[in-house]
Amino acid sequence: MTAPGPACSDTPIAGLVELALSAPTFQQLMQRAGGRPDELTLIAPASARLLVASALARQGPLLVVTATGREADDLAAELRGVFGDAVALLPSWETLPHERLSPGVDTVGTRLMALRRLAHPDDAQLGPPLGVVVTSVRSLLQPMTPQLGMMEPLTLTVGDESPFDGVVARLVELAYTRVDMVGRRGEFAVRGGILDIFAPTAEHPVRVEFWGDEITEMRMFSVADQRSIPEIDIHTLVAFACRELLLSEDVRARAAQLAARHPAAESTVTGSASDMLAKLAEGIAVDGMEAVLPVLWSDGHALLTDQLPDGTPVLVCDPEKVRTRAADLIRTGREFLEASWSVAALGTAENQAPVDVEQLGGSGFVELDQVRAAAARTGHPWWTLSQLSDESAIELDVRAAPSARGHQRDIDEIFAMLRAHIATGGYAALVAPGTGTAHRVVERLSESDTPAGMLDPGQAPKPGVVGVLQGPLRDGVIIPGANLVVITETDLTGSRVSAAEGKRLAAKRRNIVDPLALTAGDLVVHDQHGIGRFVEMVERTVGGARREYLVLEYASAKRGGGAKNTDKLYVPMDSLDQLSRYVGGQAPALSRLGGSDWANTKTKARRAVREIAGELVSLYAKRQASPGHAFSPDTPWQAELEDAFGFTETVDQLTAIEEVKADMEKPIPMDRVICGDVGYGKTEIAVRAAFKAVQDGKQVAVLVPTTLLADQHLQTFGERMSGFPVTIKGLSRFTDAAESRAVIDGLADGSVDIVIGTHRLLQTGVRWKDLGLVVVDEEQRFGVEHKEHIKSLRTHVDVLTMSATPIPRTLEMSLAGIREMSTILTPPEERYPVLTYVGPHDDKQIAAALRRELLRDGQAFYVHNRVSSIDAAAARVRELVPEARVVVAHGQMPEDLLETTVQRFWNREHDILVCTTIVETGLDISNANTLIVERADTFGLSQLHQLRGRVGRSRERGYAYFLYPPQVPLTETAYDRLATIAQNNELGAGMAVALKDLEIRGAGNVLGIEQSGHVAGVGFDLYVRLVGEALETYRDAYRAAADGQTVRTAEEPKDVRIDLPVDAHLPPDYIASDRLRLEGYRRLAAASSDREVAAVVDELTDRYGALPEPARRLAAVARLRLLCRGSGITDVTAASAATVRLSPLTLPDSAQVRLKRMYPGAHYRATTATVQVPIPRAGGLGAPRIRDVELVQMVADLITALAGKPRQHIGITNPSPPGEDGRGRNTTIKERQP
């Protein structure tokens, strides 16, 4: 670690800091610090932290300690604006030491990278030597394994030789999880000579290709679709470990020794100490295993100060806050120690703990005084920076800048102060976080006659003009010694802009690659044959050709066959598009093969679906016919409002905003639905749309189902539009009569621009002067008559609907053009996955968890789902945490009382809300980040998923505890549900089943109907497909009627059966995982054009290497199916070893002549519309007949010739020279060479 030296010019606020440090007060400080005194007490306002740290870092390396993790994030971001990459943030674990939860993989990776840079300052691959490390008191007090900085990461470079098996073994050692498809950090997958690795500190996973043991290529790929990202170049990958306690031979041996001494009892409580030690001895990582570090690691523990270079000073910011925080952390850590191990000890035969609880205390936090004493022993000076005065301290000549907090009068005063300051030749700077905001500030200064201009990054302000900079600075300062005034955007607006590190780790979109994961016994729906049960995947050789099939089981076609007798159906892989998983509530009866029951069920469903489609289309037709208002393009004010958004928009959010604006600018009334989980940024889209409408002189109504939501939106809209002349009012049950009248009058005379309210807005007596846009939040929660009212609005004003229930992608596609949809799948940048704990109910643990939340000034939800005993539950919570303010809420309370209670909880008048599942939807309380659910074994998966979505909605880490009674045995389904929720804890979790359940609800919301009977009858996926087909028919009819043409009713697409001697399959040595192989088959079967087939082939090549011959033939068969479907042919079969039969095919006379000329031995039977053609031989007489791709091409040539169309090439060839693909990669053999 070295002194970062003078500020770098390419860092945004470097020049500004350079100017500030020229003040005598800082020059004296640097001189004083140069002597490295053991103690140094400084006094300055909090806004001077950046300058003090920058001054001290000039003299040599420095460790800065803050009271909270958030303060550390912000200070690190500001220091990076001065010193660039010479600054590192050392985050603390999100978990407390004995919480039985392991810290997140990304946290561990970031910590190990910082410690590695401290230990190896010369390692250029990791960046320049560190000059400043910023951390919170939590990391300072937390003991760690000695020599963590010496733990070697795995480094791979293109062109290097690395034994393939050695690399895989090393990844396992570094605690990476092996999976068949990489989806989150800390995972890796192996496929032949290709290795996919998602390192904890990487933005995207990396695909590494080996040729033998040489690394030939590396490229990043996207988690969403598993395709390479060609724009990003990468030559070296540094993969840090995923845990700080690695299961080395020594650690495993020690665990085995302890486990042998105390064998687990027969009925061990999962998670007992014995259970944990037994697993660790086998090398299985367990959640929360870091807690037993003191008993497994014989060399004692180290502190952060032990990892620093000699003589590095520790600068503690706000020492008073740090001391309080340290005491709280130690107390809560202690509670978790007792809670965790008293439960866990019970797993041994004699019921005594295999480890001494006192000894385990060694992995808990160390007292602050002990850390200070240890620092003194190792020669680290201890310096403090306080805001409270002290006689022996050095007081710096720095003042905090005035703050306007968004009040216009105060902003004018600040501008006047700046004018006066620069008029006397002083220096002034205004720092804003975004480029757009910075440009807007220049305009606003100019409007107030204050000379201002933009500065380049790293430039210092000039005298006589306010320099405006884009950079990471939160609070302004006044430095008389440098004649400098610095104001920030926070000082003006009062809104805290988050320290969005330009590059937060990539947010994960919900997986688009959705392997059809089938396990034996799953119900599936076959379009033609109905509901069957999946048995297995088999490979059969027919006529010398190997093919894979799915075996399905159906009810016996014989009457009285009984449940035992079942019929089997072999589905070839090229017909996989006919299959979908059955989702639809209760388990249905299996269909009979060949019976008419399935056809009848489908006909009924189709009839019901037609009605809905007709209604949707007629509404669409009315909208098309009625002229709406075409809004004008964006104004400069619109750009100003959007630049002031305090967060980085996600890709989905930007797309949705663009789509909404494009709709508004068309003359046809908009009808768009925006789907996205609560907290994914739907409100911001509504704010921008509303503002756009107001710019055109139109009024906006925002309709919400509850008073709480109305208040939340009122606050958000008010804050976002505070600097603009827009009148926003609320109208709900809590609005008193006089105010309600005033609002209603304002709507009639046009003085109110935006009104946010509940269904009161829909009552008679509310008149509008010029309503232009209606925003509806959670439409499904309104009553029937309110929905009808909203529907009637749709034909003449723009309507934007927001829904938190996910909507199936397929439905979204089929509604295109009728109800437009935008889906937001990406979580906001700052959100972390919720840490999920599933375990037995234990009062000590609950008390510790609630206290930990109160420690960070947060709030908690406590879910108890029985109204009869909820008051008793609340009383128990009050006993556990007497200092907390506890309140009860449930659906049977009078509505006014319920809303008031939740309102007061939102206003932070209560700490813990003991409630039923009413919190499941729509509640957005960002300060509540701990959720405790009693009797979690009685909830459904989608309920658990929705409940967990209530917490972790801000920059704080969320915690969810799903508890079950320790003495009650869990049912198998309850166990499965809890295991699923425990495993799927990343954001937008891939909880396919729960999401399906929610999607069924979402589909009902959008279609506005109750169709559960039909959904159950045919299964959800097929139902949605029927909706799509019906809509397409109506849409065609509508277009045809508009053009004065007659319309044909669309027929159900027929399945094409191809049964030829073609060895076409995806070999298991090409794609080893059944799940992924099935996905490959399904993608090819579902391709609906040659272009889509080519795209699937590209993707397979990218993910698994060049296609082997059988896979290329499979693609050729997929193309032939498309050609047959386009020609109306449903059956292509090798009738014998010597002939091929095609049907149905009706040939006019000219085509019959052509057929006889091409194949003299061919037969055409007009009565059955069948053509039979001999299969030619590969050479002269006696040679074998053609097969595989040649045969497929022959059939294709025959079809195109008979239709009088040009020949179509069916085979898939490698476009590059043999042995190389388009990227110049060697593809001759994909298997690794020995």
From Swiss-Prot:
**Biased segments, Basic and acidic residues type:** 1220-1234
Q: Give the record's keywords alphabetically.
A: ATP-binding, Cytoplasm, DNA damage, DNA repair, DNA-binding, Helicase, Hydrolase, Nucleotide-binding
A Gene Ontology cellular component where this protein is annotated is:
plasma membrane
Q: Which segment of this protein is annotated as the motif DEEQ box?
A: 777-780
Q: Where is the Helicase ATP-binding domain?
A: 663-824
Q: Name one Pfam family in it.
A: Helicase_C
Q: What does this protein do?
A: Couples transcription and DNA repair by recognizing RNA polymerase (RNAP) stalled at DNA lesions. Mediates ATP-dependent release of RNAP and its truncated transcript from the DNA, and recruitment of nucleotide excision repair machinery to the damaged site.
Q: What is this protein called?
A: Transcription-repair-coupling factor
Q: Source species, please?
A: Mycobacterium tuberculosis (strain ATCC 25618 / H37Rv)
Gene name, per UniProt, is mfd
